[in-house]
Design a protein with these regions (language model features):
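Short, ordered coil/turn segments that flank beta-strands lining enzyme active or ligand-binding pockets
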Residues: 98-99, 143, 209-210
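Glycine-rich phosphate-binding loop and adjoining helix at the ATP-binding site
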Residues: 102-123, 127-187, 192, 230
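Glycine/GP-enriched mid-protein hinge/lid loop-to-helix segment characteristic of carbohydrate kinases
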Residues: 174-261
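Short hydrophobic beta-strand segments that form the core of ligand-binding sensory/regulatory domains
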Residues: 83, 135, 206
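ATP-binding/phosphotransfer module of carbohydrate and carboxylate kinases, centering on a glycine-rich
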Residues: 1-66, 71-107, 113-130, 168, ...
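Structural motif
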Residues: 86, 137-140, 198
Length: 267
């Protein structure tokens, strides 16, 4: 029985993955996509429809008047993601549906960000029982959910925030560099791409190469602010000085030159 239940869970996951492109699918379409047997697909699709995870679209008639096969689509409101963008003095909180549409937004001012305060923010937001995943973006370098250095938020340095969140709330969690989270949203739509952010603490960047985010060995990729702008100062040092007496066009141009010579993105 345990093995049978495990196989069913695997097949269910495979079928759900066939909907992640948000296309309309008949049971025959799903059978072709997944290479599962039609009886297996039919039974699990019916269960998913009853559980409101997918929706059956209204019956349609073919051109000859005959009944067409029912089509199914993912219920975009079945599951929400709780997304936190953590900065030095505030936390932005988004709840998004499966179609990446904003359900709600909040900005919480905090003078001293810490893991405890992040957990409290999450606790107030997961009262919505549709939240099935948590994503936290941190400025700095993060590896496997462990924060090596949080830019301007020293209290988070060395914190295994991913594990702390999962252990407290038992919800699938991802903690990563904020720019890496941003670029991952374009993974399916674009080819090689570089995203650049110019902030108070210096520039950051993230990349997709050959359709996949560049993660690096220890999460330090994209920290271009530590590169030298000239023989005396880094890009980050100039930012911390308030970009005084700096031609921003030249600043961005030099930054782009470093990125292009390494990544050579399409966009």
């Amino acid at each position: 029985m345990a093995f049978s239940s495990m196989v069913k869970d695997i097949n269910r996951k495979i079928i759900l993955e066939s909907f992640w492109d948000f296309s309309r699918n008949t049971k025959q379409d799903i059978t072709k996509k997944t290479e599962l047997s039609f009886p297996t697909v039919s039974k699990l699709v019916d269960e998913l429809n009853e559980q409101d995870i997918i929706h059956m679209l209204s019956d349609k008639r073919g051109e000859t008047g005959g009944r067409k096969a029912n089509e199914y689509i993912l219920n975009q409101e079945y599951a929400y993601s709780l997304c936190l963008k953590v900065e030095r003095e505030y936390i932005e909180v988004f709840i998004v549906d499966l179609y990446k549409q904003n359900i709600s937004y909040d900005k919480i001012e905090e003078k001293a960000i810490s893991a405890e305060k992040i957990l409290k923010v999450i606790e107030t937001k997961i009262l919505n029982n549709k939240i099935k995943s948590i994503v936290v973006g941190i400025p700095g370098f993060i590896h496997d959910g462990i924060i090596g250095m949080a830019d301007g938020i020293e209290a988070l340095n060395g914190c295994n925030l991913k594990t702390e969140i999962f252990q407290k709330f038992n919800i699938e969690t991802e903690v990563a560099n904020n720019m890496n989270i941003l670029v991952s949203g374009f993974q399916k739509e674009l080819g090689d791409i570089s995203c650049i952010h110019i902030g108070k603490n210096g520039p950051g960047s993230s990349y997709i190469v050959n359709g996949k985010p560049v993660s690096g060995a220890f999460g330090f990729q994209g920290e271009v602010g530590f590169n030298f702008y000239d023989e005396h100062r880094t890009f980050r040092e100039i930012a911390l000085e308030g970009y005084q007496n700096i031609d921003m066009i030249e600043y961005i141009g030099r930054l782009l030159l470093q990125i292009i010579t390494v990544i050579n993105p399409y966009k």
